[in-house]
Amino acid sequence: MPTLTVAELVLDRRSDELISLPASASVAEAAAVMAEREVGAVLVMTEDGLVAGIFSERDLLVRVVAGGLDPKATTLSLVMTRDVKFVTPGTSSEAALALMHLHRFRHLLVIDGPRVHGLVSMRDLVLQMIKSGEGRYESAVRQARP
């Protein structure tokens, strides 16, 4: 089986599909965008267009809800994950998953030089690996059905 990379997940995405919000956006705005676009995280950008961090469902749960903060009055800059880990398109899916596991992240930034290609999620990587299983996934699903 060939080595799978994150390139197959992000390089074919159009750059306008990159979901990002300014650091000044409210948590409520971010939650609405995430729900509408059915994603678990968004990039948070500075006024200069640089990546400031990532805001994820986990940030919403741990920092906002458990912290008793008002989502409408709390900006992303206060609750986003700042220590953003990244991979390049050539990173293997296994290496990306290992990095996520090691640092307890569910999303990684994918960059190639100065270009941001997007975010890759643990779910994206697992689905990619399942689909590449040459029919084993479909067989397992058939066997699991009553």
Question: Where in this protein do the model-derived segments appear?
Answer:
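Tandem CBS (Cystathionine beta-synthase) repeat/Bateman regulatory domains
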Residues: 1-146
